[in-house]
Amino acid sequence: MQFIDEVKIHVQSGHGGAGCVSFRREKFIPFGGPDGGDGGKGGDVIFTVDPNLSTLMDLRYRPHLKAGRGKNGMGKDRHGANGDDLTIPVPPGTIVKDAETGEILADLTEPGQTVVLLKGGRGGQGNARFTTSTNRAPKFAQPGEDEEERWLRLELKLMADVGLLGFPNVGKSSFITKVSAARPKIADYPFTTIKPNLGVVSYKNYRSFVVADIPGIIEGASEGAGLGHRFLKHVERTNILLHLIDLSWIPDRDPIREYETLNRELALFSPELAGKEQIAVINKIDLPVVRENLPSVIDWFKERGIAVFPISAATGEGIPTLLDEIARHLWGQAEEEW
């Protein structure tokens, strides 16, 4: 399924139904009183969170959405039917903004959460409601209220506990495959991952957490380079960031410089992002070239007070210890300490 995380749509609530002008016409009562019923209420525009959705793709191809119009009132005091509500399902993490002003109208994060964004117009009153002591046969009724309409911009920011960062081809997809049931595309070239992947990690004693594999970020990402800042927003809701580092490219690539570059891009995009807690994860320690350079790189991180964990996504070495550390950050302690 195509991953779409931004759409612009036009939504419109339902117009209220008109009140009815009607008079009783029954046998032996040729001049009965007014019996015009009220019009029905127009449908509302409602957003609801569907946990089974992970993209805004369906809305991309339906840019104009409209709730049902209320039916007009009828004679014999019959009320017009209310218009059908327009219910729009969205994935968890969807932000609804006014497309013109950028105002945030709703932040939808919890499964089942609903918000009424536009109210349908009220139905007009029928002439039966306007009878007075001086006007026993009113020949007028109210029209229904107008509908509301608005252009909206929807943005999806994935809901994950852990954000997985790193330059292209450092092994993020291999890592998420190893620790979860997610199966992202994996190959030995940059930008294999062109959409965020979510993996649920089943931890000890039936606890679990969600990891988001964010597509490779390069220098200039905050300004749109590479896959750009489009995906940086997906780490904003995470509690902790794992920064994967690959030493197998030495000397062609400098892993320390890449680490500093990525953090600079985070800071340029959002100072709050740069301030999130990070764990440095050195991947591919099953390779001789990585083990050779491992001590000096570990020392570099430790000198700066940065937690660092060597692992192999290929063999699984070091991963249980890393998961324990993640658990401490998320829940305050590792499972065996409970």
Swiss-Prot record:
InterPro entries the UniProt entry points to: G_OBG, GTP-bd, GTP-bd_Obg/CgtA, GTP1-OBG_CS, GTP1_OBG_dom, GTP1_OBG_dom_sf, OBG_GTPase, P-loop_NTPase
Binding site for Mg(2+): 173, 193
Domain OBG-type G: 160-331
Keywords: Cytoplasm, GTP-binding, Hydrolase, Magnesium, Metal-binding, Nucleotide-binding
Region (Disordered): 66-91
Homology family: Belongs to the TRAFAC class OBG-HflX-like GTPase superfamily. OBG GTPase family.
Protein name as catalogued: GTPase Obg
Natural source organism: Geobacter metallireducens (strain ATCC 53774 / DSM 7210 / GS-15)
